[in-house]
Amino acid sequence: MQKVKEVNANRLREAVRLRKAVYKDGKPSFSSASYDSLSLAADPSLELSYLVAPPRMAYYEKVSRQIYGIYLKYIAPEDIVVYSIDEVFIDATSYLSHYNMTAHDLAMTIIREVLYTTGITATAGIGTNLYLAKLAMDITAKHAAPDKDGVRIAELDEESFRYLLWDYKPLTDFWMTGPGTVKRLEKHGIHTMGELAYFSTVNQDILYREFGVDAELLIDHAWGLEPCSIKEIKAYKPSTNSISEGLVLSCPYPYDKARIIIMEMADSLVLQLTDKGLVTDSLTLDVGYDRENCDSGKYRGPVHIDHYGRTVPKGAHGSTKLDNPTNLGSQLIKVAATLFDQIADKTLTV
């Protein structure tokens, strides 16, 4: 919402400069509002508007399962890795000769069926490894022009990656390169993947001192390499298991209502434990506070900048160890509520 306000403030100034603004009670105003990008680009007197859609996770999950069913018409489950509710990795290598298609044609065929069945369009990235496929979707395709149905498809191999993305900024757009990693790279004068690739040829030891074993992954990615395959992902067996539950609230919640949400989330975790035949001996809780706490001007505690660039109170974090492993609902819900009581600030909205 803050970003929209900033955009509209700039649009109104531009409308005044171009003498496109309308005046109400002597003050410059917008002529109308729109959320259509083409209309907004053509008419600076339009205010940027937006639709607020309440989250419907159960429905999203239902549609996601429907789309996954379409994938299974073309690809075996052992060649698909579900990355998120709206994203998968597919190893299509052995299917291209079977269908007598290029990777682009197969991707478009699947996307078209998803579109005709669900009305949902898609973006696809094609690469010679998992990393390049992800970058092709996240960066290259999103900068490409969509077709008449809004479909974007892009392809990358090691050579085109180096040609197209070695000078690309910001580094945080690259998969698995977060803000913390970028800051540590910038200490060594590294601001692009091309600079990282060159640095690895002359100062590889510095990278290993800075990042430890993670340097190997960084160096591989700088050269467009990714040794891990879907087959290896499928074969991986973790030595320990963890189950998590996260929730983004649709509006600020006071302490008492947030406590109820915590108990409901704990109940959901219990169901997951029971379903998987697991028990737990520890519980960890992270609580984020809403920006309205800072906007009111009353909060004077520690703050940090969130992913949207907003100033918010520093979140709460805590863990607790159980005496004995359990998946008993009444016990875990009580533990979660007690932990929330211990770490959460009762005066702040969540």
Task: Identify what each model region corresponds to.
Residues 46-47, 173, 183-349:
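DNA-contacting surface of Y-family translesion DNA polymerases
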Residues 1-220, 226-230:
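Gly/Gly-Pro- and Ser/Thr-rich, intrinsically disordered tail segments characteristic of DNA damage-repair
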